[in-house]
Amino acid sequence: MSFQILPIPMWVGTQDNYAYLLLCEETRQAAIVDPAEVNVVMPILKKKLKNKEIDLQAILTTHHHADHSGGNLNLKKEFPHVTIYGGSDQNGVSHVLQDKETLRIGNVQIEALHTPCHTRDSICFYAHSSNEHAVFTGDTLFNAGCGRFFEGTAAEMHIALNAVLSSLPNNTVIYPGHEYTKSNVKFASKHLQSEALNHLEGLCNHNQFIAGHITMGQEKQFNPFMRVTDPELQKHLGLNDPIKVMDELRTLKNQG
């Protein structure tokens, strides 16, 4: 069993969001993740449906913010049979997922991982088949960074990143909700020094889109928010409590 993931940059105006099309290769069943910009996503879906490349089954919503869920209702009008999954009954969500609840898109199993902090309804979708692993992290985890704690605490983000997501297989490919990698690398380099971070910086210099290039195993090597127990980072910040390290990193990142 295998699946394909098509990143769809929705870079409209100042936006830097991604939507993603997940396709089961055996059945052609598909799901679209966070299709906020209908004018970008709809032509792609219609073309693939017309060519019978996909059988659209679901919309997966990582959280309620409009730049992730804003296209749900318009897509539902166009594709009324589609189920909209998410963490709360906002913006057209018709199936509210419980933590660790699973659904299937063809032969691909998808597990809803509750990661409240950026929003209370934040969900990461872990997709896997017998030989492939991927996770759609919305605004919880970015390459070399994480989301703001709008509706949660440093302790909750610590759990989300360093208990929930870090426990996924190291070969799990990460698909974040935004392309923030270059700015995140710039911030991370102020607090960490590693060959892994240098490699990511080189990747940024040669690629406009980083989504789908990084695994969870790699992320844990260079993401400062996933290294809050690192003695060198703790020494650098003058803190030895991982949650306080998380909070301080987020405060510093918010300051620019």
Swiss-Prot record:
It holds the Pfam family Lactamase_B. Zn(2+) 1 binds at H63, H65, H118, D139. Substrate binds at R148, F149, F150, H178, E179, Y180, R250, T251, L252, K253. InterPro entries: Clx_II_MBL, HAGH_C, Hydroxyacylglutathione_Hdrlase, Metallo-B-lactamas, RibonucZ/Hydroxyglut_hydro. Thiolesterase that catalyzes the hydrolysis of S-D-lactoylglutathione to form glutathione and D-lactic acid. Involved in the metabolism of methylglyoxal, a toxic compound for yeast proliferation, by converting methylglyoxal to lactate via S-D-lactoylglutathione by sequential enzyme reactions catalyzed by glyoxalase I and glyoxalase II. Keywords: Cytoplasm, Hydrolase, Metal-binding, Nucleus, Zinc. PANTHER family: BETA LACTAMASE DOMAIN (PTHR11935), TENZING NORGAY, ISOFORM C (PTHR11935:SF94). The lineage of its organism: Eukaryota, Fungi, Dikarya, Ascomycota, Taphrinomycotina. Its cofactor is Zn(2+). GO terms for molecular function: hydroxyacylglutathione hydrolase activity; metal ion binding. GO terms for biological process: cellular detoxification; methylglyoxal catabolic process to D-lactate via S-lactoyl-glutathione. Belongs to the metallo-beta-lactamase superfamily. Glyoxalase II family. This is Probable hydroxyacylglutathione hydrolase SPCC13B11.03c. It catalyses: an S-(2-hydroxyacyl)glutathione + H2O = a 2-hydroxy carboxylate + glutathione + H(+); (R)-S-lactoylglutathione + H2O = (R)-lactate + glutathione + H(+). GO terms for cellular component: cytosol; nucleus.
